[in-house]
A protein has these predicted regions:
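Internal maturation/activation junctions in enzymes
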Residues: 382-407, 411, 415, 430-489, ...
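Acidic/polar, glycine-rich intrinsically disordered N-terminal extensions of enzymes
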Residues: 1-148, 299-303, 308, 612, ...
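Conserved small/polar residues in nucleotide/adenosyl-binding loops
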Residues: 680-689
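Conserved, charged catalytic cores of large soluble enzymes
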Residues: 36, 48-116, 187, 191, ...
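Function-dense linear segments that define catalytic or interfacial modules
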Residues: 96, 111-115, 123-147, 153-195, ...
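Catalytic alpha/beta core of large soluble enzyme barrels
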Residues: 81, 341-350, 392-397, 484-646
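Generic beta-strand/beta-sheet core signal
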Residues: 154, 183-187, 231-234, 241, ...
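Flexible, glycine/charged-enriched surface loops at secondary-structure junctions
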Residues: 118-122, 180-182, 221-228, 314-316, ...
């Protein structure tokens, strides 16, 4: 990465001076830069033209980080691996002023590499799209624009001071680019005694304040502040909490439309659902029963809210805690909450040393679509784990005083989350249907390969750098308490050539995506290859796919097997999605952002089966329930976390005719876009009989 006058972080042990390139005068660099940018249709910068720039056409130039002395040789020809959509995503959100794509990748690699060789390999992995750092690392690695971590978990204590402390911490976290998951289950419910002379107002008014604070605070310069709130299934206010994001019904002053929410589900509750038993709602303070309700009625309420609004997220807390790291079990550290995307499961609150913890996790993801390219590279995953270790250290060194509890937690457990993207893309590239034993076999093989590599890397790093304090305290040789977590990867999957996000199936084979620079038509690249082979890659075919809600099931020239391979997310039986998620659960230290997709005509038993089987088969958490409807419904905040597959599908009777227009024009006029899936009404959802 080529940067001039990069600000130094005075608190950091890692200095961030500019990268320099020799061999060109300022005027020559300006001319080369202008020529190269014009080749890809970009305007040259209008300011700071005397700042040296890397010319795309000058391959194999060495870029040196003058502070660390580390040198990275960049290859501008690798820009060709980026799609137009990926380029626009980088330009809209992640490039610094005057920075090229390869310079960005080199900036991150050189800053977090151990030495020249490690930095070079990291650059090669990123630029070849084998893996991609999480977006805060891309945005902020090697500069003072923000922190390289944006994932935080905390909890509110049952006192006014505890509540205000949480608000204050969340303001600072959001202001510095943090996404927050907060646990509110410690607070007494509405009407319980306070000091023997008063009654509590419950959790909702305090969550409402957090809702307003979240809306007011921006995350860096890239996105609005975001937060999720979590409550256990036995809290006395759970019934109102489930409906807190529903925009209609109830007191509008007791709604929190700008927050996301999740529910911690216990095994005992699910057994009560199985047995059609009663369920006690208990005071968090003294465990006295405040109310008793039928377990199934509460379960139905949860499912109804998920189908109609997409939330709450579900976290099966006993499964999560049973699989937490051994050192956390020995220390009595409990996992009570999750994050914005339900894949981070780390302990919060007061630890065994009497200190408060705000959990922190730094993320990056390998690209499974490129699995055949990196599977036999013995350095690949160990290099990434060293990279993540340096990222977490960067946060520890540079976290401001307002994040002391987060820095403490990061120092004690050093949890990271290496995830994946491109699973469905890999299946499709290799002609493998999602629904089948071949997909199950590859799913296990790939995740077992990753698990073995990260486990060995953690142990090897513990020998070299020392075990993390939480593990060392009990004689356990682990550099990281947690090593893996599967995030949604909405943005970085776009950067990686349009790989399918996370472990999620592709939602449509053609759709439009809006960016700050315009609207892009996105076609399934693997399907396009198949259509080319069959001589069917033309606008007429793509428009017919568009008219069929992104589906290829109507294409007579495809075989049944090919139609199975290119089923969309909503066409896949979700029980297969749960099955694959369950198979890899024990190979992932934390959890996985797992959406389920529900067609508008789904029967009630199918909806129940999906969610019930997730618990029964040992899945740790469920993210959104993406439901389809013919008519758009209100679902709350316009600032919802979105992925590129969150599409609004066209009305059944709204067919798009070509009329001489290009496919891009047709897609732009259609309603296939990146909006949220609409909600479908299941107001009278009833639970089927459980055998």
């Amino acid at each position: 990465m080529l940067m001039e006058n990069l600000e130094k972080n005075t608190k950091s042990k890692r200095k961030t001076p500019p990268l320099t390139i020799s061999g060109y005068t300022d005027s020559e660099m300006e001319q080369l830069y202008t020529q190269a940018k014009s080749k890809i249709g970009e305007k040259p910068p209008t300011e700071n033209l005397n700042e040296p720039k890397m010319d795309f056409k000058v391959a194999d130039r060495s870029v040196q980080h003058s502070g660390t002395g580390k040198t990275v040789k960049i290859d501008p020809s690798r820009d060709s691996l980026l799609t137009d959509f990926g380029r626009e995503t980088l330009e809209d959100r992640y490039l610094m002023k005057g920075e090229s794509f390869q310079e960005l990748f080199a900036r991150v690699a050189s800053y977090y590499g151990d030495d020249d060789e490690h930095s070079q390999r990291l650059y090669d992995y990123i630029s070849q799209l084998w893996f991609m750092p999480a977006t805060p690392i891309l945005s902020n690695g090697g500069n003072k624009r923000g922190l390289p971590i944006s994932c935080f978990l905390n909890e509110a204590n049952d006192s006014l001071d505890g509540i205000v402390d949480l608000w204050t911490e969340n303001v600072w976290l959001a202001a510095r680019g943090g996404g927050i998951g907060s646990y509110w289950g410690n607070l007494r419910s509405i009407g319980e005694s306070v000091g023997g002379v008063g009654k509590t107002s419950g959790i909702v008014p305090f969550i409402k304040v957090m809702d307003s604070l979240t809306l007011a605070i921006s995350q860096g310069s890239l996105r609005r502040g975001s937060a999720a709130v979590y409550l256990p299934i036995d809290h006395p206010e759970i019934e109102e909490f489930i409906e807190i994001r529903r925009p209609t019904g109830g007191d509008p002053n007791r709604k929190a439309l700008n927050l996301h929410h999740g529910v911690l589900i216990s095994d005992s509750f699910m057994r009560a659902v199985e047995e059609d038993g009663e369920w006690d709602l208990r005071s968090p303070k003294d465990q006295t029963v405040q109310k008793t309700i039928p377990a199934r009625s509460l379960w139905i309420r949860l499912l109804t809210a998920r189908v109609e609004t997409g939330e709450p997220y579900l976290v099966f807390k006993d499964r999560v805690n049973n699989l937490r790291p051994e050192q956390q079990k020995l220390a009595g550290l409990e996992i009570k909450t999750s994050n914005l995307c339900s894949e981070i499961t780390l302990p919060t609150g007061t630890d065994h040393h009497g200190k408060e913890r705000t959990a922190v996790c730094c993320l990056s993801s390998v690209n499974i679509e490129k699995y055949y390219e990196w599977e036999n590279d013995k350095n690949f995953i160990p290099d990434i784990m060293r990279f993540l270790d340096n990222v977490i250290q960067d946060f520890i060194d540079n976290a401001p005083e307002t994040m002391n509890t987060a820095a403490y937690s990061a120092m004690r457990e050093r949890s990271v989350g290496l995830g994946v993207m491109g699973l469905h893309s890999f299946f499709q590239a290799n002609n493998i249907p999602w629904e089948g034993v071949t997909a199950k076999s590859w799913n296990k093989k790939i995740f077992n390969h990753i698990k073995e590599a990260v486990d060995k890397s953690s142990q090897d790093l513990a020998e070299i750098k020392g075990a993390c304090p939480d593990a060392e305290e009990y004689g356990i040789k682990e550099r990281f308490s947690n090593k893996t977590a599967v995030a949604p990867t909405a943005s970085i999957s776009i950067i990686c050539g349009g790989a399918s996000p996370g472990i999620e199936p592709i939602a449509a084979n053609v759709y439009s995506h809006k960016t700050l620079s315009g609207t892009f038509t996105v076609r399934n690249a693997n399907l396009k290859k198949l259509l080319i082979e069959k001589g069917q890659d033309n606008d007429e075919v793509w428009i017919s796919i568009l008219n069929n809600r992104g589906s290829v099931q109507h294409l007579d020239f495809l075989t049944d097997h090919e139609k199975d391979v290119f089923k969309t997310a909503i066409e896949i039986d979700q029980r297969w999605l749960i099955d694959l998620a369950a198979d890899r659960t024990e190979m992932i230290d934390q959890a996985q952002s797992l959406n389920v997709f529900v067609p508008a005509d789904s029967d009630k038993k199918y909806i129940h089966d999906i969610h019930y089987s997730a618990w029964k088969k040992g899945v740790k958490s469920l993210y959104y329930c993406r439901s389809q409807s013919i008519q758009r419904a209100e679902t709350g905040s316009s600032d919802d976390v979105k992925s590129k597959e969150d599409i609004q599908l066209p009305d059944e009777d709204k067919k798009i005719e070509k009329k001489g227009k290009t496919l891009d024009e047709m897609v732009a006029e259609s309603s296939i876009n990146d909006d949220d899936y609409d909600a479908v009404s299941y107001t009278h959802l009833t639970l089927p009989t459980i055998a």
